[in-house]
Curated annotation (Swiss-Prot):
PTM-bearing positions, type Tryptophan amide: W7
Annotated protein name in UniProt: WWamide-3
Highest taxon of source: Eukaryota
A GO biological-process term: neuropeptide signaling pathway
Key words of the record: Amidation, Neuropeptide
């Protein structure tokens, strides 16, 4: 993802 999770 962007910079929130680890996905």
């Amino acid at each position: 993802w962007k910079e929130m999770s680890v996905w």
